[in-house]
């Protein structure tokens, strides 16, 4: 029987242990996609307590707490920070089998150094007090934690109208050597059917100093804002494609669609597809020209619980997996980009694991141009960001493509404690390759496989995103 969370956690073969401890463990972190608030990095935020750093804004934990019968006031409501922490501590013993149980205790170990204790009502007081004592120290500020975890680069997620003043302040601070770069997330300019689209167009007009009445005007405004992002080091875009659509339209049709929407009319399903396709084709051309990487996060079904959405808003744990067809519209979208000689480096993530093989084979259709791994099947995302999901994604990537060219893990998180997910990923990667060796499916060549692991953990991403550190 193995002990829980030892130094060899998940490393069930000798070869896996060698790979992890000699090649993976000490690799820096290149966190190319996250949702950390850049203002907290700029001001080197000091966390008030363990709730502030660990529970605030964490929809993974809120879902588990609700499932455990915890009242909403103890999740997102007006309960005190300590009450919310205790409610989480009471939930943790019930999360065995859920990645939250592993993440919780990995996060206590790093960076807090709390080992040999499982979070529960019996230990919540001690862990609350010890964590709060550490949070008062310099190494546990926002920047301090990033430095402790050996982070070299983070890519935040930013709206085109953002002034990026926090990124500018971080870049100007010579005392901080971690790259914090913006990522372009233009969903609000893309989702023409959304209730707030017209208001957003007005805000985009102001940010770009451009009047928007025709489709070409929208492109000019977006281009100006991309110039602004590029000036602050942006090399990456990200799109939430909850449903992948494709529809062709000429500029006259696009002008009419936009004009009707700006006049307060809802677009038809066909018009939505035409507008979204046109925006993506325009943007992909700009990404290609600017040598940016584009990311598509595909397949979320958001805000399912209308009552709770009306009470507490979006992004608070009421999203799930969608099951819309994506193979044909995605193929047509990427093909159209290729026909324009404007297909940039692209990472595709799917939320529905049913679509793993669709994505795994789709990226192979558009590789080439002398660029290794140009098209990427992205790491297990959101509900797949757990042991089973990571194993499935990497297994299918290996079977359908080249695992050795994989750009690896990202936190996709709002929490400064989520860097242990890179450790979790690395252990699972080494476990998988170690088992291949044990089963005679891969050679016991530590130099060959060690270099592969090292590349997946850090080097591939740094090379792919072409960001100097």
From Swiss-Prot:
InterPro entries: Metal_Hydrolase, Uronate_isomerase. Its EC number is 5.3.1.12. It catalyses: D-glucuronate = D-fructuronate; aldehydo-D-galacturonate = keto-D-tagaturonate. GO terms for molecular function: glucuronate isomerase activity. The keyword Cytoplasm does not apply. Keywords: Isomerase. Pathway: Carbohydrate metabolism; pentose and glucuronate interconversion. GO terms for biological process: D-galacturonate catabolic process; D-glucuronate catabolic process. Belongs to the metallo-dependent hydrolases superfamily. Uronate isomerase family. NCBIfam families: PRK02925.1 (NF002794). PANTHER family: URONATE ISOMERASE. This is Uronate isomerase. It comes from Yersinia pestis. The gene is uxaC.
